[in-house]
Amino acid sequence: MRRGRSLLGGLLIGGVALAAVSAVPSPPWTPTADLLSAPLPAPPPGQQDLLRAEIERLGAGHDGEVGIAVLDVTNGWSVDYNGQAHLPQQSVSKLWVAITVLGAIDRGDFKLSDTVVIHKEDLSVFHQPLRDRVGPGGYRTTIARLLAAEIQQSDNAANDALIRQVGGPWAVQIAIVGKSLGEIRFGPGEREMQTRAAGLTWKPEYSFGRAFWDDREKLPPARRRAALEAYLANPPDAASPLDIVDTLARLQQGELLSPQSTAYLLDLMAGTQTGATRLRGGLEPGWRLRHKTGTGQVMGALATGNNDVGLLTAPDGRVYAVAVMIGQSRAPFEARQALMQAVARAVIASHRPAGAVPPI
């Protein structure tokens, strides 16, 4: 008790002294010139600013024409580098075929289980694994299997079969316009687009063996170069990274297809087998990617249409739409793949809380 009285007395005495001091008026405070002229400290950069700076650094540092866009589907903001450039899609355009087909299924025009027969004269050019299954009587399959081959294996013959199913390339373009997917172009289909870009005219032999490559190599280099440059100057399958990430975000949010068809397409994209060293090569444990790749023709050191677009999902469920499009580049293959991986890593790093350590 004695100690308590002593403490109380001290507090009372101190309070009286403080009151006495406070009663004495002090001169008004005036800021010095240095304080008046000193700028306020900038707030720490946010996730969007950090990601924008890194995306711009990556895009500007690549030897070629590059477009990159990232859209935070959860919060609605986006960053980009050259995001409005209209660049060749190549097989990225297979996404719009799938959306057109599934939209027709939603309307009741046909079903996933409907049968489609593919004959040798229906085959396409370049990568088409189902070609080996087409015998003298054709190959009987379903729309569901063609969609899986088109998205997951980037099978050109499967893609062409689905285009025929919905009414041709123009039907796909009508679907793109009808769903307000920006300025995305679909193009005339693989046969015409690839042969024209090579300086050739389509003929059925190009579906087999090395006939396409042999004829292309016989062309005078100047003719082939002129054809490829004409394609790059005005790609019939052009799209901008910003339009693509906007479309992917709308797909994720269920704005383009029925809930069943949306889930179906996203599941197909999760099983994509191409592009292991592109965006997917930059993932960390716990992150998921649903995507579609595209790859164009190569002439000497010039590579065209190297793309990967998709939806990156964080362990906490936040989703980012990402598009990396390399319209043309003389950078080595490894550098092109590294750019796509670096973009994925940049998104992941920007999502991570400040000071957090990446998982091992």
PLM region spans:
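Structured C-terminal helix/loop/strand segments within mature extracytoplasmic catalytic/sensor domains
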Residues: 3-6, 10, 17-58, 169, ...
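Carbohydrate-binding/catalytic loop surfaces
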Residues: 139, 200-207, 288-296
